[in-house]
Amino acid sequence: MNKKAAVLCLDAGQTGVRACIDIPKPDGGEERIDLPEKPGVKNSHPLIPQLIERTHDAFRMFSSYQNEPMNIGKDTTIGSICVGSSGLSKDCRAEDFLDGVSDMGISEVFLAHDSVTGYLAALGHERYGAVVSAGTGVVTRGVGPHLTKRVDGWGWMIGNAGAASWMGKLALEAAMRAYDGRGPQTRLTKVAEEHFGRLDKIYLKLYSDDQSTKHLGSMAEDVTRLAGEDAVAFEICSKASKELAISAYTALRKADVDKYADIAVSGRGSVFNSRFISDHFTMYIHSMVPHAAIIDPIGDPLSGARQLGYIEPDNPLHSLIAHAIK
């Protein structure tokens, strides 16, 4: 990686793509400049073209910042890109990505699934453990000295247990059960109406909406807010906390580090902004792995993406990073 050139980092999720530019400073450090968030990637579409488009968006913003308002020097160039993305699979070739962005003078790219960059963001590359990244969706990554394991991240229809969209889906189900008389009355009925309108019309909106996952996830904050006042909301949040803890424990076990004395577990993402979720997650983790240290993330996903170029070959995560250079 060219240490004299700036590095563009992308955190590409389904609800938004965040970007920053790390500019080298004379003292050997870096200055980070965050760029405006752009629309998220769609897992139903080819990923590489979407990442190329978002890179061009970031490059145009970078060019405008070389004047006002950031006054970045005109001699500053971007030499490499580090990307953590939802939906990244083995058929997403770093070479294809590099071909699509080389017109901007970029000569090196690193690509990884966002479970990898999420892990690096929370625990770095020198500590073993598990990281649960829970926002609209959820994916968990466990890392040991020899193995790494991904858990969940399979989308709102068949996975994402404990994620915001998962909680929103359960909240809608509870509201519809109450509406029909199949379940108890709940304050989540009002939440559903505030987000989607008339209950008897929700299904028409939901099934024709290509942003349904995002809109389901938008209910989660209200669900967690009501956990102390509504029995149904309490049950949903308790289940979510336990599912997230089960994913973390499974990742530790599959990475063969659950018996290690010095392991860490970290939860990151908007779901963990809820005190109810974070406290119950910790409780469930300690019931499964009493010796695990629960720690706050040391960085954010963009800082995790920035580390992709520094992962040593003997780290299990190294094999999950696609790299191309000209």
Feature roles, as predicted:
Residues 1-64, 70-79, 100, 121-130, ...:
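ATP-binding/phosphotransfer module of carbohydrate and carboxylate kinases, centering on a glycine-rich
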Residues 88-186, 322-326:
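Phosphate-binding/catalytic loop of phosphoryl-transfer enzymes
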